[in-house]
Amino acid sequence: MLTLYGETFPSRLLLGTAAYPTPEILKQSIQTAQPAMITVSLRRAGSGGEAHGQGFWSLLQETGVPVLPNTAGCQSVQEAVTTAQMAREVFETDWIKLELIGDDDTLQPDVFQLVEAAEILIKDGFKVLPYCTEDLIACRRLLDAGCQALMPWAAPIGTGLGAVHAYALNVLRERLPDTPLIIDAGLGLPSQAAQVMEWGFDGVLLNTAVSRSGDPVNMARAFALAVESGRLAFEAGPVEARDKAQASTPTVGQPFWHSAEY
C-alpha cells in the first residue's frame, strides 16, 4: 500500500493522461493499470472548447480513479499558485502535483521557485507533490517547506532514458528513508520501473512511456506488473552482489570422488 499525506492507495503506480491516441485508449489504459491516481493538467482538461473539456473530465470520472491535478507549463511561483487554486475549484481536490519548469530544453524543475510555491500552497491547505530533481539538499528544503512526499525525476521528461543518475537517486533514498519518494519522468521501459522500485522507491509516475508506446493498453499493464514485482523484490530482500562465485548446491554428502582429498 502506498501512503501519502496519511491516505493509503492500493497501487504504487500513478498514470498521466496526456498524448494518448484516442480517449477510449486512455480509458482502457487506466482501467488496465488500475493506478493510485491519474494526473491531469488544468490546461489539458479545459482545452478544445467547453464541450471537449467537459467530455475529457467526464471520461476521467468514469474510471473511478482519484485525480491528481498538476501545474504543467508553469514557470513562475504566481502562475503555479494560481493554477493550483483554479485546479482545486475545477477538480474539487486539495491534491496538487507541483511543477515549476526552469529550462525549456531539459524541462528541469526550478527548485528555488519550487520551494517558495510549495510553502504558499501548503499554508493554503494543499497536499503538495513536488516534481523535483534528485538533488538531496533541494529535496530537504522541500520537506522543510512542509511537503510530506517528493517526486524526483529519473531523467528529463519524455526521454525514456531510465535512471541516469543512479548514484544520486540511491543516496536520496538512503538519506530520506521515511519520506515517500515517487519517481516521476524519464522512465521508458517496465524494466526501468522495476529497477527503481527494487531500490526502495515508493512509487512511479508515468505518461509518455505508456501513451506514446505502440500499444498503450498493454504497456500500461506491463508497467503495473513491473512496479508490483519491483516492490515485491525490494520487500523480499535481494541477495548481495559478489565478486566471486558461490555454489548454490551444498558440498555435504558428495560422492568421495568429488572430495578435494583422495
UniProtKB/Swiss-Prot annotation:
Record GO biological process: thiamine biosynthetic process; thiamine diphosphate biosynthetic process
InterPro entries: Aldolase_TIM, Thiazole_synthase_ThiG, ThiG
Active-site annotation: K97 (schiff-base intermediate with dxp)
Gene Ontology annotations for the cellular component aspect, listed alphabetically: 2-iminoacetate synthase complex; cytoplasm
Keyword Repeat: no
Record localization: Cytoplasm
Region (Disordered): 243-262
Catalytic EC class: transferase
Binding site residues for 1-deoxy-D-xylulose 5-phosphate: G158, A185, G186, N207, T208
Family matches, as Gene3D superfamilies: Aldolase class I
Enzyme Commission number, as recorded: 2.8.1.10
Origin: domain of life: Bacteria
One of the record's GO molecular function terms: thiazole synthase activity
Annotated catalysed reactions: [ThiS sulfur-carrier protein]-C-terminal-Gly-aminoethanethioate + 2-iminoacetate + 1-deoxy-D-xylulose 5-phosphate = [ThiS sulfur-carrier protein]-C-terminal Gly-Gly + 2-[(2R,5Z)-2-carboxy-4-methylthiazol-5(2H)-ylidene]ethyl phosphate + 2 H2O + H(+)
SUPFAM superfamilies: ThiG-like
Key words, A-Z: Cytoplasm, Schiff base, Thiamine biosynthesis, Transferase
Subunit and partners: Homotetramer. Forms heterodimers with either ThiH or ThiS.
Similarity annotation: Belongs to the ThiG family.
HAMAP family linked to this entry: ThiG
Protein name: Thiazole synthase
Source organism (scientific name): Neisseria meningitidis serogroup B (strain ATCC BAA-335 / MC58)
Lineage, top ranks: Bacteria, Pseudomonadati, Pseudomonadota, Betaproteobacteria, Neisseriales
